[in-house]
From Swiss-Prot:
Organism (species): Variola virus
Family of the protein in this entry: Belongs to the orthopoxvirus OPG002 family.
Gene Ontology CC: one annotated term: extracellular region
Signal peptide: 1-22
Gene: OPG002
One function term, GO molecular function aspect: tumor necrosis factor binding
Protein name per Swiss-Prot or TrEMBL: Cytokine response-modifying protein B
Glycan attachment sites: N101, N173, N189, N215, N248
Amino acid sequence: MKSVLYLYILFLSCIIINGRDAAPYTPPNGKCKDTEYKRHNLCCLSCPPGTYASRLCDSKTNTQCTPCGSGTFTSRNNHLPACLSCNGRCNSNQVETRSCNTTHNRICECSPGYYCLLKGSSGCKACVSQTKCGIGYGVSGHTSVGDVICSPCGFGTYSHTVSSADKCEPVPNNTFNYIDVEITLYPVNDTSCTRTTTTGLSESILTSELTITMNHTDCNPVFREEYFSVLNKVATSGFFTGENRYQNISKVCTLNFEIKCNNKGSSFKQLTKAKNDDGMMSHSETVTLAGDCLSSVDIYILYSNTNAQDYETDTISYRVGNVLDDDSHMPGSCNIHKPITNSKPTRFL
């Protein structure tokens, strides 16, 4: 049985490679069939895909066809003198969607994040990077050539990535995208401020009299501003985040404050909350006061979902001594006054 099958395959191969036994003929109506070509007014057999005409027909012998070699192809009936070369390997910003074989050319298309600037018969000839939507913008569609269309995130949605793929996402529940910390202290001298620093996981305000340090862990909103100003021996300071990242509800944003007086006082106390209007947002705080230089301290911490319809907030406060008015003067930085970011809640403006 195997020998019979082998002979049958060999017979078919002979038909393809040798162009059958039929001789070229003169067409009665002057037209050749679709699988034929005309040469010297004779209709001759074309070579099938995957082969080429190693010898054209004459009056007695039909076309002789030879298989294409590696890296070459023919994709249709032909009487070409040689097979066509496949396209080269795909570029680094492309993916191969069809490999080179004897009947098909290699096809390369653009990788994710790219779009085709120049289309060819065998895939894309030139891929370029898609536009990346900035923070606060999401992908809303694509142009006719495949570039990204960016649109601002509407109310109730947000985006905190720079991406050519991410869309605006619904604002998550029971979380926050903004943290505002206000610290008011008395008494402090007019010349006490020396510098402010931001160091990533630890924000600090240093003065000749005291140091305010805030350590934070697992907080997705990123702290980006701080200030310190003094008026009539009442100092006002604050720390603020941006609004482009939401807190991961599986993690607890933990803030640890230390207000340390730069004297030899040995007192040390951990403050308890004076006010706790917090709800379902995931956060935790501790406040430590070291030294004896301050008689009164107010600390307000506000967690906000600025995209929520009802402007969701959690407010935490701590107090030592008298109630201090932290709304009576414009915040500044080392005696250089500057306005607070427009995104600050009205409670602290």
